[in-house]
Amino acid sequence: MDYKKEGKEILEGIVIAIVLYLVISLTLSYALKVDNPVAVVISGSMEPVYYRGDIIVIKGTDPASIQVGDIVVYKRPYQDIPIVHRAINIIEEDGALYFVTKGDNNPFEDSYFENGKKFPGVPDYAIMGKSVMKIPKLGYVTIFFKRLIGVRI
């Protein structure tokens, strides 16, 4: 058994996987008009629509086109993890749009705070886009690596 050759083949496989991931991610990012076109579901808040470990594909969306019932993806200013919840109400206040969101499996609506101020919902500028597709359970790979090396992939 040639360990040097096997090690080289494993390294080549890892490099190819990383390059493929980057090419696919950049292509999706451009095509879907969003910086981060994929997210991993890490909680059960959207069951039975999405389960922990599902990967969702995000499409950048003009917030004005979002309707009640759409599943939106947003980020809070103090968290790097995208939140995937359903828009259950839309509030227009002083010319700004706010989306009241809630996980299908959660008992309460989401709260949104920024700089100590509570907003009536998720502000339009925090919306990344809408969920347009899911890949069941594939996200467990990234959850595993995150736990293994302590880094978000």
Kindly label every feature range from the protein language model.
Residues 1-2, 68-71, 89:
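Soluble, non-transmembrane catalytic domains of enzymes that act on hydrophobic metabolites at membranes
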Residues 31, 35-42, 64, 82-153:
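Acidic/glycine-rich C-terminal interaction modules and beta/coil loop segments
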Residues 54, 72, 115-116:
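Short, glycine/charged-enriched secondary-structure capping and boundary segments
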Residues 64-76:
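Short coil-to-beta transition motif at edge beta-strands of beta-rich domains
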Residues 78-80:
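Glycine-centered tight beta-turn/hairpin loop motif at sheet-sheet or coil-to-beta transitions
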Residues 1-65, 136, 140-153:
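Protein maturation boundaries and topogenic segments
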